[in-house]
C-alpha cells in the first residue's frame, strides 16, 4: 500500500480579505498569502484583473470548502470610465480602436443608467477568461482572432453615477451578480452614448459577505512578521513568521456562510455529524426540504448540509 505523502505547511484555516494592489495577478496574490501563512491549502473566491485593485477574498485550509458560497455573493465595484476612446481590451492596457470628440453630459449618463440596471444581456470582452471551443478568449484574442462571444444574462442590482470630475471621465459604483464584466459596461455605455469609453480605473470594494472594513494590505500582513537578519529575499523564507499575530488577521471560516441558517448542536449530535450520519434537527423556523443550513458545535462551524423531512444530512464536514 502506497504511503500517503505528508502535507506541507500548517493546517491554518480562515479568510484573508486581501487588498490586492494594481499590477498583481490574483494567482500571484494567493501564492504570496499561502507562503506568508505557511498554509497547507489556499484559493481565491473570484478573479480580479491585474489592472484592478481591491477586495480579493483568499481562503486558507478548511475555508476553501466555502469558496463557492462567496463566489455566488454580490460584488461592488467603483470604477472610472474614460470617454472618447474604445480600446481592444476595454481598459487602459489595450490599443485604441475607435475615437470620438463627443463627451457625454451628466444628464445623458443619468438617463442611460436605468437600461443597465436589473437583468441585462452582456457580451464579455474579447480579452476575457470565457472558454470558446475549449480555448480561453484572451488566448485567441492575443493571436489576433476576432471571436464571437455569445451574450449572457447578468444582474446589476444598483448602478450609481458617483461624480464627473471632468468631461473626460466619470466615476461609477455598481453592485452586481456573478459573471458581470465591468469592462463590458464601459464599452457598451460608450457606444450607447455615441462617444466610446473604456475602464481607466477599477476597484472592488465588496464581495458579500466581505466589505472594505475587512480589508488587509500586504504591508499590514508583513508587519506581523519580523525580518530574518540572514537574508532579505522573501522568496527564500526571509521572514521568521509570528503566526499568532498573523492568524489574528484571519476572518473565521464560517463568516462566508452568513447567507445560510445556522443551528447549534449538542455533544451527541455533533459526534454523529462528525461521522457523517444524519440527525433530527429542530428548526426555529419553517425550512424547506433540500434547503442548505449550517450546524455549529461550540460556536464553531461543523458542517453544511441539507434538510430532508426534518433530518439534517451533512454534505461538507469541517475539521474544528
UniProtKB/Swiss-Prot annotation:
Catalytic residues (positions): 49
Assigned EC number: 5.4.99.25
Carries keyword Electron transport? no
Return the HAMAP family for the record.
Answer: TruB_bact
NCBIfam families, per database record:
TruB (TIGR00431)
Say which family it is in: Belongs to the pseudouridine synthase TruB family. Type 1 subfamily.
What this protein is reported to do is described as:
Responsible for synthesis of pseudouridine from uracil-55 in the psi GC loop of transfer RNAs.
Q: What is this protein called?
A: tRNA pseudouridine synthase B
Q: Which organism is it from?
A: Bartonella tribocorum (strain CIP 105476 / IBS 506)
Amino acid at each position: 500500500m502506497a504511503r500517503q505523502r505528508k502535507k506541507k505547511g500548517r493546517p491554518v484555516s480562515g479568510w484573508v480579505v486581501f487588498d490586492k494592489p494594481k499590477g498583481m495577478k490574483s494567482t500571484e496574490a494567493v501564492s504570496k498569502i499561502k507562503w506568508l501563512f505557511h498554509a497547507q491549502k489556499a484559493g481565491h473566491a473570484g478573479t480580479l484583473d491585474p489592472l484592478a485593485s481591491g477586495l480579493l477574498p483568499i481562503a486558507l485550509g478548511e475555508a476553501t470548502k466555502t469558496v463557492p458560497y462567496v463566489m455566488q455573493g454580490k460584488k461592488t465595484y467603483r470604477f472610472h470610465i474614460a470617454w472618447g476612446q474604445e480600446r481592444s481590451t476595454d481598459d487602459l492596457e489595450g490599443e485604441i480602436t475607435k475615437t470620438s470628440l463627443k463627451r457625454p453630459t451628466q444628464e445623458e449618463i443619468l438617463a442611460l443608467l436605468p437600461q443597465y440596471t436589473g437583468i441585462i444581456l452582456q457580451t464579455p470582452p474579447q480579452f476575457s477568461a470565457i472558454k470558446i471551443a475549449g480555448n480561453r478568449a484572451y488566448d485567441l484574442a492575443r493571436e489576433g482572432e476576432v471571436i464571437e462571444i455569445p451574450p449572457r444574462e447578468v444582474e446589476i442590482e444598483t448602478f450609481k453615477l458617483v461624480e464627473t470630475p471632468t468631461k473626460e471621465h466619470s466615476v461609477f459604483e455598481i453592485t452586481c451578480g456573478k459573471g458581470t464584466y465591468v469592462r463590458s459596461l464601459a464599452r457598451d455605455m460608450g457606444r450607447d452614448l455615441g462617444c466610446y469609453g473604456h475602464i481607466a480605473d477599477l476597484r472592488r470594494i465588496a464581495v458579500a459577505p466581505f466589505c472594505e472594513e475587512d480589508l488587509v494590505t500586504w504591508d499590514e500582513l508583513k508587519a506581523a512578521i519580523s525580518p530574518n537578519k540572514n537574508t532579505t529575499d522573501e522568496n527564500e523564507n526571509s521572514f521568521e513568521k509570528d503566526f499568532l499575530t498573523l492568524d489574528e488577521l484571519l476572518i473565521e471560516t464560517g463568516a462566508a456562510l452568513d447567507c445560510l441558517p445556522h443551528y447549534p448542536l449538542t455533544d451527541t449530535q455533533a459526534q454523529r455529524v462528525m461521522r457523517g450520519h444524519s440527525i433530527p434537527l429542530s428548526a426555529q423556523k419553517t425550512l424547506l426540504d433540500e434547503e442548505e443550513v449550517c450546524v455549529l458545535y461550540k460556536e464553531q462551524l461543523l458542517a453544511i448540509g441539507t434538510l430532508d423531512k426534518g433530518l439534517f444530512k451533512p454534505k461538507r464536514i469541517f475539521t474544528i
